[in-house]
C-alpha cells in the first residue's frame, strides 16, 4: 500500500489508476503484515533513455582519502520523486565511495534547480515523510553537490 503525504492525497482520489510509476521502498509494516511505502508516485515516462544528466560533484575534504570528483549523473525519468532520487544517490554513494561502510556516515547533498531553488538532504538521517512525495522535473535539475565528511 502507498501512503500519500500532504497534498498528494488530493491528486489521487480514485481507487485505481493506469500509467503510474510507483517507487516502492518499504517504510512500514503493520500488524497484518501489510507493507507500506510513503509517496514515490509519478506519471509514467513518455520517452525512454536518459532524460537529464546534471553534474554530480562529490567531495570529501578531510583525511588522507580526500577527493573532489565531478561527472554527469544520468536520470532516465522526466519526473522523479525526491524519495527515488535520494535512494538512488545514496545507493550510488554506497557502491562507488563506501558511504556508511568505509567513510563517515556524515554528509550532505544539495540538489540545485535551474530556478534557483534547492533541496538539502542529510546523509545521517532518513528522508522525512513529508518530502517523499515531492516531484522534481529532472530537466530542471542544474547540479547535485555531495559533501562527505
Where are these regions (language model features)?
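Generic hydrophobic segment detector
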Residues: 1-9, 14-17, 84-88, 124-127, ...
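Proteolytic cleavage junctions
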Residues: 124-149
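Long, low-hydrophobicity ectodomains and other hydrophilic envelope-associated domains
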Residues: 1-69
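Low-complexity, intrinsically disordered regions enriched in charged/polar residues
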Residues: 14, 28-32, 75, 79-83, ...
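Mature extracytoplasmic domains of secretory-pathway proteins
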Residues: 49-117
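Generic detection of short hydrophobic beta-strand segments and adjacent strand-loop junctions
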Residues: 119-121
Amino acid at each position: 500500500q502507498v501512503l500519500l503525504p500532504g497534498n498528494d492525497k488530493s491528486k489521487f482520489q480514485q481507487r485505481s489508476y493506469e500509467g503510474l510509476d510507483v517507487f516502492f521502498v518499504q517504510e512500514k509494516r503493520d500488524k497484518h503484515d501489510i507493507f507500506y511505502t510513503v509517496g514515490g508516485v509519478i506519471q509514467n515516462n513518455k520517452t525512454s533513455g536518459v532524460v537529464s544528466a546534471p553534474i554530480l560533484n562529490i567531495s570529501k575534504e578531510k583525511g588522507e582519502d580526500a577527493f573532489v570528483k565531478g561527472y554527469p549523473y544520468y536520470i532516465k525519468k522526466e519526473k522523479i520523486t525526491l524519495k527515488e532520487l535520494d535512494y538512488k544517490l545514496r545507493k550510488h554513494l554506497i557502491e562507488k565511495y563506501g558511504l556508511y561502510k568505509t567513510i563517515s556516515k556524515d554528509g550532505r547533498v544539495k540538489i540545485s534547480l535551474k530556478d534557483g531553488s534547492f533541496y538539502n538532504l542529510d546523509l545521517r538521517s532518513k528522508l522525512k515523510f513529508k518530502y517523499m512525495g515531492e516531484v522534481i522535473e529532472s530537466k530542471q535539475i542544474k547540479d547535485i553537490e555531495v559533501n562527505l565528511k
